[in-house]
C-alpha cells in the first residue's frame, strides 16, 4: 500500500504520513457486529487512575472479531475489507455459505472475492485457519491460539506473524517476531499468512492532537515532577533523577524481568532478543 506524505499547508500537516489503501470499504461498518465501546479514562470503579495516559478520544464502536474461526467445513467469501479503529490491522467482512457474516483479521494480500475456510481439512492457503498439527513446518502463520478453543492471542497486530519451526509430540515450536521461541499445543489453531497493513508502522501522525484523537494522553517525565509524584522528582534546578531509572512505584524500569508466570516458563524455549 502506498504512503501519502501530506503537503505542509500548516504546521500540523507538515509531518503527516498516511497509509492509503484504496481497497478499504468507504461506507458504514456491518451493524449487527458492532458493540458499544465505553471509555473509562483509565479509571476503575472507585474513580482512581489505574492506567495512566488514557482519556478523551473519538467515540468508537467495537467490531466483534471472530478470533476462534470455528465454522469448520463451511466455505466463506470475503465481501470487503474495512478499517478498524480499535486495532492496527485491517479487518475483513466474510460471508459464510450458511448466510452468517463475521469479521476476521485481514491477512496480507487478501482482497474482496477471496474464498477462505476453516478446519483440519482446509488447504494451506493465506487466510485459512487450521489446527497447527495440520500445518507444515516452516509455514508463516498469525492469529495463534495459546489454548485450544480459546481464540487467537498471538500475532494479531498489523504485520505480525510467527513461523512454525518444529513439531514434537503434542506441541509445535514457534518463532515469534520478537525472537522468542516457544511451544504451543498442536491442537491450537492458527491462520496461514501474516497480518496485513504492515506499513502501519511507517505512518506519522504529525501532531500531538492526532494522538489525543486516539484517546492517548501525554506522558510526563519523572524528572519533571515533584518528589511526591515520582522517585525521580524534585531537586534544585534540572537533575538527572539521581538514581537508576525506576517507575513511579519504584520498580527498576530498564532490564528488570517482570514475567511472573513460572508455570509456563517451561514452554519458552528461548527468550526474546534484547
From Swiss-Prot:
SUPFAM superfamilies: Nucleic acid-binding proteins, Translation proteins SH3-like domain
A Pfam family: Ribosomal_L2_C
Feature: compositional bias, Low complexity: 39-48
Keywords, comma-separated and alphabetical: Ribonucleoprotein, Ribosomal protein, RNA-binding, rRNA-binding
SMART domains: Ribosomal_L2, Ribosomal_L2_C
Top-level division of the source organism's lineage: Bacteria
Chain spans, region Disordered: 28-54, 223-265
One annotated Gene Ontology cellular component of this protein: large ribosomal subunit
Subunit-structure text: Part of the 50S ribosomal subunit. Forms a bridge to the 30S subunit in the 70S ribosome.
NCBIfam families attached to this UniProt entry: rplB_bact
PANTHER family listed in its UniProt record: LARGE RIBOSOMAL SUBUNIT PROTEIN UL2M (PTHR13691:SF5), RIBOSOMAL PROTEIN L2 (PTHR13691)
Name by which UniProt lists this protein: Large ribosomal subunit protein uL2
Species of the source: Alteromonas mediterranea (strain DSM 17117 / CIP 110805 / LMG 28347 / Deep ecotype)
